[in-house]
């Protein structure tokens, strides 16, 4: 574990001596930086892989990018301010990585699961000039977290891979199916897949997004 970045992180450095492409991993609610980092051993060695720990601790363990609150009737809402604070810290990490690990500022990808997926999508739509590829697993577009849309030209270089479990019991698949529609309305290139699983990443899902990323880094 290393902590040169604003958030606790684990890092796998690239085999390249300079200008390495970057993949930033954002875990889901209640997890930590080591969860998605398990993918690192199977991903291209030229990638500098940075797995970040969300800033808000949960009891008895785990971390969150923002609180999810419930009222007496079990209605649910997100803490938008915490989400925006987390996105600002993630952006600081992305900017710091360039000098720390000699990475390529024009080749930064995000991979997020669940809550991490929701923020990955929002970060790319709010800061399209910063990112190249987005892998969004088991999440959706939360419009509360988005800035006003930019001109379509701002998004023309972005590529999105999104996937969801057709039996997801945490985030309804119907929410995820709205993601490609929104991306297409902005002229953004995207791929969407569903797999016969719940709230998780099937092996077939992993191999599909791995190849998708290899073709684009």
Regions found by a protein language model. Name each.
Residues 129-141:
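A conserved short beta-strand
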Residues 53, 111, 137-138, 195:
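Alpha/beta-hydrolase-fold catalytic nucleophile elbow
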Residues 102-112:
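Alpha/beta-hydrolase fold nucleophile elbow
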Residues 139-217:
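The feature captures the conserved acid-bearing segment of alpha/beta-hydrolase catalytic domains
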Residues 112-116, 120:
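Gly/Ala-rich beta-loop-alpha elbow adjacent to hydrolase catalytic centers
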Residues 27-29, 111-113, 165:
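Conserved alpha/beta-hydrolase "nucleophile elbow" surrounding the catalytic nucleophile
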Residues 38, 122-126:
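Active-site signature of alpha/beta-hydrolase-fold catalytic machinery across serine-
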Residues 5-103:
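Serine-hydrolase catalytic machinery in alpha/beta-hydrolase-like enzymes
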């Amino acid at each position: 574990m290393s902590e040169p970045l604003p958030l606790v992180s684990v890092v796998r450095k690239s085999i390249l001596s300079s200008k390495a492409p970057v993949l930033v991993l954002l875990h889901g609610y209640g997890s930590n930086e080591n969860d998605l980092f398990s993918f690192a051993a199977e991903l291209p060695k030229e990638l500098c892989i940075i797995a970040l720990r969300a800033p808000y601790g949960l009891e008895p363990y785990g971390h969150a990018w923002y609180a999810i609150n419930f009222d007496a009737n079990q209605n649910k809402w997100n803490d938008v301010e915490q989400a925006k604070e987390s996105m600002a810290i993630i952006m600081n990490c992305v900017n710091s990585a360039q000098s720390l690990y000699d990475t390529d500022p024009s080749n930064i990808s995000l991979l997020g699961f669940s809550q991490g997926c929701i923020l990955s999508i929002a970060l790319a739509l709010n800061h399209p000039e910063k990112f190249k590829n987005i892998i969004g697993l088991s999440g959706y577009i939360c419009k509360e977290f988005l800035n006003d849309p930019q001109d379509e030209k701002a998004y023309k270089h972005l590529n999105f891979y999104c996937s969801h479990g057709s039996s997801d019991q945490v985030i309804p698949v119907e929410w995820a199916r709205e993601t490609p529609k929104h991306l297409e309305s902005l002229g953004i290139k995207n791929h969407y897949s569903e797999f016969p699983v719940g709230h998780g990443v099937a092996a077939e899902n992993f191999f599909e997004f791995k190849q998708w990323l290899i073709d684009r880094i």
